[in-house]
Amino acid sequence: MLADVVGPICESGDFLARNRKLPSLRQGEFIAVMSAGAYGFSMSSRYNSRPLAAEVMVKGGEFELVRKRETYHDLIRGEKVPDFI
Protein backbone atom coordinates (compact mmCIF):
# COMPACT_ATOMS: atom_id res chain seq x y z
CA MET A 1 0.00 0.00 0.00
CA LEU A 2 1.26 3.50 -0.82
CA ALA A 3 0.36 6.02 1.89
CA ASP A 4 1.19 9.28 3.60
CA VAL A 5 2.11 8.89 7.27
CA VAL A 6 0.69 11.87 9.14
CA GLY A 7 0.30 13.05 12.70
CA PRO A 8 -2.81 13.96 14.69
CA ILE A 9 -2.60 17.74 14.23
CA CYS A 10 -4.69 19.44 11.52
CA GLU A 11 -1.73 21.21 9.95
CA SER A 12 -0.30 20.90 6.45
CA GLY A 13 3.20 20.23 7.83
CA ASP A 14 2.17 17.41 10.20
CA PHE A 15 3.57 14.49 8.25
CA LEU A 16 6.32 11.94 8.79
CA ALA A 17 6.48 10.46 5.29
CA ARG A 18 4.79 10.96 1.95
CA ASN A 19 4.04 8.29 -0.64
CA ARG A 20 5.67 5.63 1.55
CA LYS A 21 5.23 1.97 0.70
CA LEU A 22 3.71 0.25 3.75
CA PRO A 23 2.44 -3.26 4.47
CA SER A 24 -1.32 -3.64 4.83
CA LEU A 25 -2.38 -2.14 8.14
CA ARG A 26 -5.57 -2.54 10.14
CA GLN A 27 -7.25 0.13 12.24
CA GLY A 28 -5.65 0.34 15.67
CA GLU A 29 -2.22 -0.94 14.61
CA PHE A 30 0.85 1.15 15.41
CA ILE A 31 3.76 2.29 13.26
CA ALA A 32 7.16 2.65 14.95
CA VAL A 33 9.26 5.60 13.80
CA MET A 34 12.84 4.39 14.11
CA SER A 35 15.99 6.52 13.89
CA ALA A 36 14.13 9.66 14.94
CA GLY A 37 17.33 11.02 16.43
CA ALA A 38 17.76 12.90 19.66
CA TYR A 39 15.14 15.57 18.97
CA GLY A 40 12.03 13.90 20.39
CA PHE A 41 12.22 15.38 23.89
CA SER A 42 13.74 18.74 23.03
CA MET A 43 11.45 19.45 20.07
CA SER A 44 8.22 17.93 21.39
CA SER A 45 5.27 20.28 21.72
CA ARG A 46 1.91 20.49 23.44
CA TYR A 47 0.56 22.51 20.52
CA ASN A 48 -3.19 22.13 19.96
CA SER A 49 -3.55 20.71 23.51
CA ARG A 50 -1.87 17.43 22.60
CA PRO A 51 -0.21 15.56 25.49
CA LEU A 52 3.41 14.58 24.84
CA ALA A 53 3.97 11.12 23.41
CA ALA A 54 5.92 8.36 25.11
CA GLU A 55 9.51 7.82 23.99
CA VAL A 56 11.33 4.53 23.72
CA MET A 57 15.09 4.29 23.24
CA VAL A 58 16.20 1.37 21.08
CA LYS A 59 19.72 0.00 20.64
CA GLY A 60 20.11 -3.27 18.80
CA GLY A 61 17.64 -5.70 20.31
CA GLU A 62 17.26 -3.74 23.55
CA PHE A 63 14.68 -1.07 24.30
CA GLU A 64 13.63 1.03 27.28
CA LEU A 65 10.79 3.47 27.94
CA VAL A 66 12.60 6.76 28.61
CA ARG A 67 9.55 9.01 28.90
CA LYS A 68 6.00 8.00 29.78
CA ARG A 69 3.10 9.23 27.68
CA GLU A 70 1.74 12.44 29.17
CA THR A 71 -1.84 12.41 30.45
CA TYR A 72 -4.45 15.13 30.09
CA HIS A 73 -3.97 15.90 33.80
CA ASP A 74 -0.22 16.36 33.18
CA LEU A 75 -1.08 18.74 30.34
CA ILE A 76 -3.27 21.06 32.44
CA ARG A 77 -1.48 20.69 35.79
CA GLY A 78 0.08 24.17 35.68
CA GLU A 79 -3.06 26.02 34.56
CA LYS A 80 -5.58 27.89 36.70
CA VAL A 81 -8.97 29.30 35.74
CA PRO A 82 -9.37 32.79 37.23
CA ASP A 83 -12.22 33.28 39.72
CA PHE A 84 -13.78 36.01 37.55
CA ILE A 85 -14.58 33.55 34.75
Where are these regions (language model features)?
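Charged (often Lys/Glu-rich) extended helix/loop segments that serve as interaction or gating elements
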Residues: M1-I85
